[in-house]
């Protein structure tokens, strides 16, 4: 509907330019927003205030001329001026009902694919291998997954890239420790304890540390024995990650892994090409790039270190190689990096160097989708009681156990298998939704009690809202698709729910554009709340007549499908019963 109103305004502006009311050459970004008070219309635009100065007119006077020039459209009943010059639009409820009927018949719930399809790289998760995933990996994994799902739904060709840390000192450490302490494959599968023991040895013995670094050099040189051990460690670690991804219902597979090691052969080319471009400068023995736009507090240029003084490469080198691959080989139009916002400067520098060096050979927008930290109740980074890092598997296991206790209290008669399945869906969903519902760039405090609450903007509340819709149709022995008749919006609660359901497409477009799943969470929470009000105030099964009953069933069916589709795009499973 917003697009329709923008088009109507644009046609009116074109007419006013032709009439000489507006000067030629104006290209305003026409903004249309939902109104809060529906008595003053459904949508509002500030276009008259934006153009009053170039038009040389008062905003309200220009608004009158814009309204007079608006083409007639069945979807709008009237437009009127409000306040200093806003133009409020009232939508035709019959036209709205027609759009919702069409959405109910559509496999995509009325959501159109957005513009021309583009290839989008989504860089997400990216744990360092050789040890188990911890809570710090949660946000990149699930936010990236949610945005990737939305972009795919909107028509993008999404290429997921799990840029795992599968190269470097930690592998030399593990190999050196394995040489000292030969163990079986079964024992090696407990990678966390093995890593901890190797790290302790590395920190305590300089001789061991030297051996570990020497093995890294051999690994980088292609030593067959080192490569075989590295492959074993990597495979074990990736299998651990894959179990987490499956538990989280995240669309990441082994085929999406494109780790640091994948770019090894191109690192020397990155260095040589930067050198050929005259961009490399030696500083304290290291090879660096200095860009004028990045300076420290004293106004001195900040270095982007490409090669360390000891000849080693850094993250920037690998990230530059990844940019070349994503632009030159994948031919991506857009690359989204879901990495902690504390890395903002790093990515600003990498992107700037890549552009200046000509590494972006295929036009590609690069965006760092930074995120805040997940903290404990004390507002500090989430830790175990003894100050250690919380394993992600432990967190997810506890979430399921807590959910199991809650579900069993509410439904003690359920079979054990059903209890466990509901606990899994609710527990995992609660952890994911608590994160996804927060603004991506915000820090937040992890709280099991809040996220498992059946009231408020939580996964349990939304899952329950969906089961309420499903329950209506279960009583009738019908599916969402088996409802006849047409939607007829008479009661205010029907109209409010209908107007919200019609916004699904624009909400998804906003998520895809900004990389902010919390917008979708807020929307689904509002849909659930409006459905609850509709359900309580507009009898469905005991409606006044059959036409009203079918209309309300259709509205309920669309609410159910919207909730289910929205939760699926967030990576949350739904339940038919709770």
UniProtKB/Swiss-Prot annotation:
Hey, which family's this protein in? Belongs to the class-I aminoacyl-tRNA synthetase family.
**What HAMAP family does this protein map onto?**
Arg_tRNA_synth (MF_00123)
Location in the cell reads: Cytoplasm
Q: Which organism is it from?
A: Pseudomonas fluorescens (strain SBW25)
Q: What class of enzyme is it?
A: ligase
GO molecular function per UniProt: arginine-tRNA ligase activity; ATP binding
Tell me what gene encodes this. argS
Protein name per the record? Arginine--tRNA ligase
Under Enzyme Commission nomenclature, its number is 6.1.1.19
Q: Name one Pfam family in it.
A: tRNA-synt_1d
């Amino acid at each position: 509907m917003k697009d329709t109103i923008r088009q109507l305004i644009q046609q009116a502006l074109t007419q006013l330019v032709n009439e000489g009311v507006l000067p030629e050459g104006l290209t305003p970004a026409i903004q249309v927003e939902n109104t809060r008070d529906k008595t003053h219309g459904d949508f509002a635009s500030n276009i008259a205030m934006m153009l009053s100065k170039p038009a040389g007119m008062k905003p309200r006077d220009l608004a009158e001329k814009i309204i007079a020039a608006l083409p007639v459209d069945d979807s709008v009943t009237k437009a009127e001026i409000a306040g200093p010059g806003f133009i409020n639009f009232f939508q035709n409820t019959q036209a709205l009902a027609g759009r919702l009927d069409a959405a109910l018949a559509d496999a995509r719930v009325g959501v159109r694919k957005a513009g021309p399809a583009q290839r989008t790289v989504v860089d997400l998760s990216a744990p360092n291998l050789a040890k188990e995933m911890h809570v710090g990996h949660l946000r990149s994994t699930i936010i990236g997954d949610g945005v990737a799902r939305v972009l795919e739904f909107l028509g993008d060709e999404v290429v997921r890239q799990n840029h795992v840390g599968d190269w470097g000192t930690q592998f030399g450490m593990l190999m050196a420790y394995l040489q000292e302490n030969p163990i079986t494959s079964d024992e090696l599968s407990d990678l966390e304890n093995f890593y901890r023991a190797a790290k302790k040895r590395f920190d305590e013995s300089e001789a061991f540390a030297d051996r570990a670094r020497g093995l890294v050099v051999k690994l980088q040189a292609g030593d067959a024995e080192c490569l075989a051990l590295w492959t074993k460690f990597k495979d074990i670690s990736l299998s651990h990650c894959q179990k987490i991804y499956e538990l989280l219902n995240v669309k990441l597979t082994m085929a999406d892994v494109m780790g640091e090691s994948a770019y090894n052969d191109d690192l020397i080319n990155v260095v040589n090409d930067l050198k050929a471009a005259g961009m490399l400068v030696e500083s304290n023995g290291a090879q660096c790039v200095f860009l004028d736009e990045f300076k420290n507090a004293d106004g001195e240029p900040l270095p982007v270190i490409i090669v360390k003084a000891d000849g080693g490469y850094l993250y920037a080198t690998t990230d530059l190689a990844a940019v070349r691959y994503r632009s030159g080989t994948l031919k991506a139009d857009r690359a989204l990096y879901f990495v902690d916002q504390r890395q903002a400067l790093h990515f600003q520098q990498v992107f700037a160097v890549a552009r200046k060096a000509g590494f972006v050979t295929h036009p590609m927008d690069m965006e760092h989708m930074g995120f805040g930290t997940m903290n404990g109740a004390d507002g500090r980074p989430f830790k175990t009681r003894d100050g250690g890092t919380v394993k992600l598997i432990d967190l997810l296991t506890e979430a399921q156990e807590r959910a199991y206790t809650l579900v069993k209290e509410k439904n003690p008669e359920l079979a054990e298998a059903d209890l466990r399945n509901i606990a899994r869906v609710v527990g995992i969903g609660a952890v994911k939704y608590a994160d996804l519902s927060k603004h991506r760039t915000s820090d937040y405090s992890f709280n099991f009690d809040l996220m498992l609450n059946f009231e408020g903007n939580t996964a349990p509340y939304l899952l329950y809202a969906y089961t309420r819709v499903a329950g209506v149709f279960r009583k009738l022995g019908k599916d969402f698709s088996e409802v006849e008749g047409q939607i007829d919006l008479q009661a205010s609660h029907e109209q409010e729910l209908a107007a919200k359901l019609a916004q699904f497409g624009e909400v998804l477009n906003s998520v895809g554009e900004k990389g902010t799943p919390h917008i979708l969470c807020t929307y689904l929470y509002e849909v659930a709340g409006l459905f609850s009000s509709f359900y309580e105030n507009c009898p469905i099964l005991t409606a006044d007549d059959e036409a009203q009953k079918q209309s309300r069933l259709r509205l309920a069916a669309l609410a159910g499908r919207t909730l289910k589709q929205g939760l699926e795009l967030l990576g949350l499973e739904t339940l038919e019963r709770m």
